């Protein structure tokens, strides 16, 4: 019975920590760049694009395909940074909890 109470207490603590992390993540920003900084995209912690910067040299019709590729690459880089930050925060939050391998938070 004590073990169950201890697990319930840890679950409540984890829930409170997760809420705090989610609030912190909402304020996080990451910028991804591509093409030697010709394109940059900034995301917030909810993976919403907050800024896109495109070098004027890419704004030519014949450069459209290159620009599309660079935008995707910059977005993917920024998204990876956000994902890594979330993973690090989650690791620190769940330290010491007996979670199965590959278990991801938030649910």
From Swiss-Prot:
* Record keywords, A-Z: Cytoplasm, DNA-binding
Name the Pfam families on file.
Answer: YbaB_DNA_bd
Tell whether DNA-binding is among the UniProt keywords. Answer: yes
Give disulfide pairs as residue numbers.
none
Q: Which GO terms describe its cellular component?
A: bacterial nucleoid; cytosol
GO MF entry, a single one: DNA binding
Q: Which SUPFAM superfamilies match?
A: YbaB-like
Keyword Cell inner membrane part of the UniProt annotation:
no
- Localisation: Cytoplasm, Nucleoid
Q: How does this polypeptide assemble, per the annotation?
A: Homodimer.
| Family as reported in the entry's similarity comment | Belongs to the YbaB/EbfC family.
Q: Which NCBIfam families match?
A: DNA_YbaB_EbfC
- Write out the function statement from the record: Binds to DNA and alters its conformation. May be involved in regulation of gene expression, nucleoid organization and DNA protection.
Name this protein carries in UniProt? Nucleoid-associated protein BT_0257
Q: Tell me what organism the protein belongs to.
A: Bartonella tribocorum (strain CIP 105476 / IBS 506)
Query: Lineage in the entry?
Result: Bacteria, Pseudomonadati, Pseudomonadota, Alphaproteobacteria, Hyphomicrobiales
């Amino acid at each position: 019975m004590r073990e169950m109470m201890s697990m319930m207490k840890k679950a409540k603590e984890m829930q409170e920590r997760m809420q705090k992390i989610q609030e912190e993540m909402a304020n996080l920003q990451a910028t991804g760049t591509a093409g030697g900084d010709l394109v940059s995209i900034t995301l917030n912690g909810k993976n919403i694009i907050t800024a896109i910067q495109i070098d004027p040299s890419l704004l030519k019709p014949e450069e459209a395909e290159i620009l599309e590729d660079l935008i995707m690459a910059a977005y993917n880089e920024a998204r990876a940074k956000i994902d890594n930050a979330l993973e690090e925060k989650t690791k620190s939050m769940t330290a010491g909890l007996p979670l199965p391998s590959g278990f991801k938070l938030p649910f």
